[in-house]
Structures are given as structure tokens and as C-alpha cells.
Regions:
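Patatin-like phospholipase
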Residues: 1-35, 45-233
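Gly/Ala-rich beta-loop-alpha elbow adjacent to hydrolase catalytic centers
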Residues: 36, 40
Length: 233
């Protein structure tokens, strides 16, 4: 049975989500559909494309450290360098990106996208899903596919599954109270590293929540069993 794994809005908590995603890499994700918005897009697209989560995180931190660009440009330029066409293909109909469309009266409407024409279209979609006016750039909205788009958070669906399947939701306050200021976009790489480790450790401490929905990858499970046998000997 297909499971939907949902990553909510995040701001700087994208680093926390990536820590969780490093743990999820140990599980069988072959029958999983991901949905997400804002920084919650990153773990979704990386887990679908089997990229190494920690390597991605280390590289984006290095990029952030050496860039004075807005978050809009950081995300766009870094993903353009990092992602391959194969990564985009791995996300076709396996990742549901949540966006907020501003209608003619600038009122928010929920929109989802799960297929893309090419790598450029894919990256533009993710950038739009992450766009918070003023905080991420100097525009009021992003133009995407001819529509006025902002972060999916503004349509109130970031915590809501898209499908009717069994789901596993990750949001900032799932396992602990998170001060709202932690969600503000930050380029403090030391702070972002601490959030990553916090997410990783919280996932391990609450592993039963994950194991109630996902099964460990068979290769990883066999390795764990073999390690246990060696320890008993």
C-alpha cells in the first residue's frame, strides 16, 4: 500500500527536516509518495532521487556561506548546480509540491504540481514553493507557469496530506516545542548545523513513529541483523 510522507513548511527548519531525512534513508521508500512545501520540499526531492542527504546539506551550507544572494537566488542557483535531469525524473509523480496561487484579488488558493516539463520547470516550482515575500526576495510573489505564486504555507495546507493514503507527517512541533523564531530564514551555518543534528537525533529518539509506517530497507535490515550476530559472538 502506498504511503504519503508529508513535510510541512519550515523556514530554517529545513535543516531539521534534512536531519530527519538522513534517518529515513535507511527505510524502504519504494512505495512512498512525498508531499511538501517550503523547505519541506528538499527532503522530498532528495529521498526520491536517492541523493546523500548529509552531502547535500554540507554543500548547501558551503554555498550559503559564500553567497550574498537572496534565498530565492540561493535556492535556484544551488539546485541548478546540484540536481541532475535524472533527479528530476525520479520525482515525476512521486513528489507533490504544494503552492499558493494568488488569484485576481490576491487571495490565496491551494495548488499542487506533481509533474514537470524539464529541470528548469522543476527548480522554478521548488523556488516558488519556498518563496516568502520580503524574507526570500524583494518581490511580492513569484511568477510560475503564468500564475502569481508564494510559499504553500499561505494556503493553509502545509500540514495536510494530498492523498487519502496512510500518511506520516513531519512538522516543526512534531516531537518538541519549537520557538517560532527558529522558523525565520537564517544563513547562520552553525545554527543550521545544530538544527540538522537536532532533527537527526529527534528522529532516532522517536523511531517508533517512523517504524509504525515504514519498513527498513532490506539491505539495511540484513546489515543490522548481521551486526547484531557479530556483537552476540
Amino acid at each position: 500500500m502506498t504511503v504519503e510522507v508529508v513535510f510541512s513548511h519550515s523556514g530554517s527548519m529545513f535543516a531539521y527536516y534534512l536531519g530527519i531525512a538522513e534517518v529515513l534513508q535507511e527505510y524502504d521508500l519504494s512505495d512512498v509518495i512525498f508531499s511538501g512545501t517550503s523547505g519541506g520540499c528538499f527532503p522530498c526531492i532528495l529521498l526520491n532521487s536517492s541523493n546523500n542527504i548529509r552531502d547535500f546539506f554540507d554543500e548547501i551550507l558551503e554555498y550559503v556561506k559564500n553567497s550574498n544572494d537572496s534565498w530565492e537566488n540561493v535556492i535556484k542557483n544551488f539546485l541548478t548546480e546540484y540536481l541532475s535531469d535524472e533527479d528530476v525524473e525520479a520525482n515525476q509523480n512521486k513528489f507533490i509540491c504544494k503552492l499558493t496561487k494568488l488569484n485576481d484579488f490576491l487571495l490565496p488558493e491551494k495548488v499542487t504540481v506533481s509533474s514537470w516539463r524539464d529541470k528548469e520547470d522543476f527548480i522554478n516550482c521548488v523556488v516558488a514553493a519556498c518563496y516568502v515575500p520580503i524574507m526570500c526576495g524583494n518581490k511580492f510573489y513569484i511568477e510560475y507557469r503564468g500564475e502569481k505564486i508564494v510559499d504553500g504555507f499561505f494556503s493553509g495546507t502545509s500540514n495536510t496530506p494530498v492523498t487519502n493514503n496512510e500518511h506520516l507527517l513531519f512538522h516543526p512541533n512534531k516531537w518538541r516545542y519549537i520557538n517560532p523564531t527558529w522558523m525565520l530564514p537564517s544563513k547562520d551555518t552553525v545554527w543550521l548545523k545544530s538544527l540538522y543534528e537536532l532533527g537527526y537525533n529527534d528522529a532516532l529518539a522517536n523511531i517508533q513513529d517512523i517504524q509504525s509506517v515504514l519498513k527498513m530497507n532490506k539491505e539495511k535490515e540484513l546489515k543490522t541483523q548481521n551486526d547484531s550476530v557479530r556483537q552476540s559472538e
